[in-house]
Design a protein with these regions (language model features):
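Active-site segment of metal-dependent pyrophosphate-handling enzymes
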Residues: 92-94, 143-172
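Conserved beta-strand-loop-alpha-helix junction that forms the acyl-donor binding cleft
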Residues: 44-52, 124
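N-terminal strand-loop-strand
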Residues: 78-119, 146, 150-153
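Conserved donor-binding loop and adjoining core beta-sheet/short helix segment
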Residues: 1-32
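Acidic, metal-coordinating catalytic segment for phosphate/diphosphate chemistry
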Residues: 53-95
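The catalytic Nudix box helix
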Residues: 118-152, 171
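Conserved GNAT acetyl-CoA-binding A-motif
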Residues: 36-46
């Protein structure tokens, strides 16, 4: 079972893969032969429980695209000019400017790197809104409950963790 994508590719979900590795290999070989002339890409999500399928896919020219804790997404480029969109090329962080009624600004010291003061904030989790991350990070680091008002600045830093860029969103 496959689905079409905006890049003239087809996507195969892990739950639609056969249980048997030999059947997977034959199905993949047949699929490539059947679509190589009219599709640009083939995407395959492989669940961690089927990780023994990965070497089979790479043998057929699939490369690693992205992953999560329980799956990997592989892609095979069938046409030279095919567009393969990048994924996860930034980490995201949020910082909070918290000013009280006395016009005092809230600063913290990190537990590990505590040689300087900084604004409370941190990593924006996967599928988390900026406003949620802001409130969560300030509360986790200070115990103070805040409400997101607005974004006041965005910073871009490279290199950062994992050889990626970082977007730092500063909020009130």
């Amino acid at each position: 079972k496959t689905s079409l994508d905006p890049y003239n590719g087809i996507t195969i979900l892990s739950e639609d893969l056969p249980k048997d590795i030999l059947e997977f290999e034959q199905n993949l070989k047949d699929l490539i032969q059947n679509v190589k002339d009219n599709k640009n890409l083939i995407w395959i999500y492989i669940d961690i429980k089927k990780s023994d399928f990965i070497p089979i896919a790479t043998k057929f020219g699939f490369t690693f695209h992205s992953c999560n804790s329980d799956y990997i997404l592989l892609v095979k480029v069938l046409k030279e000019n095919a567009i393969v969109p990048n994924l996860a090329n930034h980490t995201l962080g949020v910082g909070a400017v918290v000013i009280n009624s006395k016009n005092e600004i809230l600063l913290i010291k990190e537990i590990i790197r505590n040689e300087y003061y900084k604004l409370p904030g941190g990593h924006i989790d996967d599928a988390e809104m900026i406003s949620q991350a802001l409130s969560r990070e300030v509360f986790e680091e200070t115990g103070v409950v805040v409400d997101f008002e607005r974004i006041i600045s965005i910073g871009h830093f490279y290199p950062h963790q994992f050889h990626k860029s970082n977007l730092y969103v500063l909020c009130l």
